[in-house]
Swiss-Prot record:
The N-terminus is cleaved by ribosomal processing cysteine protease Prp. One of its GO terms (cellular component) is cytosolic large ribosomal subunit. The lineage of its organism: Bacteria, Bacillati, Bacillota, Bacillota incertae sedis, Caldicellulosiruptorales. The keyword Repeat does not apply. One of its GO terms (biological process) is translation. It comes from Caldicellulosiruptor saccharolyticus (strain ATCC 43494 / DSM 8903 / Tp8T 6331). Keywords: Ribonucleoprotein, Ribosomal protein. Pfam families: Ribosomal_L27. The gene is rpmA. This is Large ribosomal subunit protein bL27.
């Protein structure tokens, strides 16, 4: 009895180790939410930020996470005061009286 072995070697690659990359944190959706001259209601968020890149002006409150929000219904006003960016809300009644 004669045995015949047909040995075939195929290309192969050993599995590599896992990488340590490939993760990222979720975006925090920071930034300006209402633009200059835009009508806002009291309580609307104007700016979401880390730190005070924008400072609260008239009729604008600052939350615990430095979020700026409107305290009154009116129109948003962005301005520079003493080298600081300041966000204010001009009440709707004042805008009507000025026109």
């Amino acid at each position: 009895m004669k045995l015949i072995f047909d040995i075939q070697l195929f290309a192969h690659k050993k599995a590599g180790g896992s990488t340590r990359n490939g993760r990222d944190s979720e975006s925090k959706r920071l930034g300006v939410k209402r633009s200059d001259g835009q009508f806002v209601l009291a309580g609307n968020i104007l700016v979401r930020q880390r730190g005070t890149k924008f400072h609260p002006g008239k009729n604008v409150g600052r939350g615990g996470d430095d979020t700026l929000f409107a305290l009154v219904t009116g129109y948003v006003k962005f301005e520079n005061k003493r080298g600081r960016k300041v966000v204010s809300v001009i009440p709707a009644e004042e805008m009507v009286a000025a026109q």
